[in-house]
């Protein structure tokens, strides 16, 4: 649904952020990378991303110059820097930067920022009456990065690791030293929905990343863990109030 441009002259950093962060969990299905501000500016002008993550000190065009070039655009910016430099940070703040992170990047901290950002973006879509706004309510329970219960966090992690398989509740909690009834009750108390409901919502969320990649819908159903296409279609309509084919038409 959303797009991000990651700009850093260190390949290991930009590729690391691209691969490690679970972008699909935050509705980002298109991730572009650039090694300097010149490449980033071209990508931003061409694709109009909702988020730009950029280093400050880079060859050819640094982060502050890039910010000057995109100041007129409606995109959010996160600044990365190895330098705890107040003047550079102040320059970024003047350009309405979303946040400022020092390297090495704390991935958990970045995910907290992404969680806040996607809530704002989805709220804006809803207020603007955009056709994909139903995603806001359907996937709201998935946006929280961490819960204050160890067992709940373990179950969520297991769901994200095994949603593509025909996993059951028993499978999800087999490595957790609690009863199935306790796990189900605790999960519902903290998350507000059942484990099975969370699993199915997460599967549908992941399916959105595949709908524009020329897969057959029955192939997508299998890739996200549904044993039958009709179950995929049922849950898709349940959470998004439209069929997969209608979603594809409206997303174009």
Curated annotation (Swiss-Prot):
DNA-binding region: 170-191, 217-240
Signal peptide: none
Residue(s) carrying 4-aspartylphosphate: 55
Keywords, in A-Z order: Cytoplasm, DNA-binding, Phosphoprotein, Transcription, Transcription regulation, Two-component regulatory system
Pfam families for this protein: HTH_18, Response_reg
Residue ranges of domain HTH araC/xylS-type in the record: 153-250
InterPro entries tied to this protein: CheY-like_superfamily, Homeodomain-like_sf, HptR, HTH_AraC, Sig_transdc_resp-reg_receiver
GO terms for cellular component: cytoplasm
Subcellular location: Cytoplasm
CDD domains per the UniProt record, alphabetical: REC_YesN-like
Functional note: Member of the two-component regulatory system HptS/HptR that regulates genes involved in hexose phosphate transport system in response to changes in extracellular phosphate sources. Activates uhpT expression to facilitate glucose-6-phosphate/G6P utilization by directly binding to its promoter. Antagonizes CcpA-dependent transcription of a subset of CcpA-regulated genes involved in antibiotic susceptibility.
Protein name (record): Transcriptional regulatory protein HptR
Organism: Staphylococcus aureus (strain bovine RF122 / ET3-1)
